[in-house]
Swiss-Prot record:
Signal peptide bounds: none
Annotated function: This protein binds to 23S rRNA in the presence of protein L20.
GO biological process, one term: translation
Single GO molecular function: rRNA binding
PROSITE patterns: RIBOSOMAL_L21 (PS01169)
Protein name: Large ribosomal subunit protein bL21
PANTHER family reported in the protein's UniProt record: 50S RIBOSOMAL PROTEIN L21, LARGE RIBOSOMAL SUBUNIT PROTEIN BL21M
The UniProt record lists the keyword Ribosomal protein: yes
Family statement: Belongs to the bacterial ribosomal protein bL21 family.
Length: 103
């Protein structure tokens, strides 16, 4: 059984027991919560597709960790001008463990 849900403007395909990295959510570590925007649920041959969401479907998850991703370097370079601009960015993420899928 797996489900596709939407969080942080992205769609994620998950099954029970899976750990997923999402865009930062303001939820404390160890806390349980639910995603209501489930787009599709598949259980063997039974496929439920929402228009746009599946009515009554939920993905239950627990926050495992909060953190920051790897550094991404941004470089702007102008040739022959002795000019260079360098910048870095680390995106915040929330790691969640999927504990249940209800359809």
């Amino acid at each position: 059984m797996y489900a596709v849900f939407q969080s942080g403007g992205k769609q994620h395909r998950v099954s029970e027991g899976q750990v997923v990295r999402l865009e930062k959510l303001e939820i404390a570590t160890g806390e349980k919560f639910e995603f209501d925007s489930v787009l599709m649920v598949v259980n063997g041959e039974d496929v439920k597709i929402g228009a746009p969401v599946v009515a009554g479907a939920k993905v239950v998850a627990e926050v495992v960790a909060q953190g920051r991703g790897d550094k991404v370097k941004i470089v702007k370079f102008r040739r022959r001008k002795h000019s260079r601009k360098q910048q870095g960015h680390r995106q915040w993420f929330t790691e969640v463990k999927i504990t249940g899928i209800q359809a």
